[in-house]
Amino acid sequence: DILLLHLIGVNVILVHGGGPDINAMLDALKIESHFENGLRVTDKDTMDVVQMVLAGKVNKGLVAYLSALGGKAIGLCGIDGNMIQVHTKNEKLGLVGEIDHIDTDVIDSALSAGFIPVISSVGIDSHGQPHNINADTAATKIAAALNAECLVFMSNIDGVMKDPKDKDSLLHKLTVV
């Protein structure tokens, strides 16, 4: 579907996370991980793994997949060109970023050159420190910065939950306010 949209002239941008791959790598490296309110507490070692997995393995895997299908994709990270600018969300969470600004220059350049930008959800603060960002939040902020006509979420979870710990709290209808 991504390639079809691209072929008919729709500017498609793919923003991704990679929680399961991050978990697998943290486990393999024997780095303990825990969550607070659905957000991964991210110390420096964890951030190194997050960046390695998202900007490396997952991002390049998606680019390779799209390329194998005949697409023209380019792998980007929110750090590139200071694209996703953040500040630390909460000291308790460590290097988890709250998005302050999206600089669309790199995205616009990639789109103008005919590429499908594939963007990993890692941001950067004013001191050059990478931060972990929720991919859904990054996608939403990027779509808003680009005045996108449409935003589509694909996920490995059932949908939006009123209580993330309660699978019966799935919201079947959302209203934009």
Language model features with spans:
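Nucleotide/pyrophosphate-binding catalytic subdomain
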Residues: 1-177
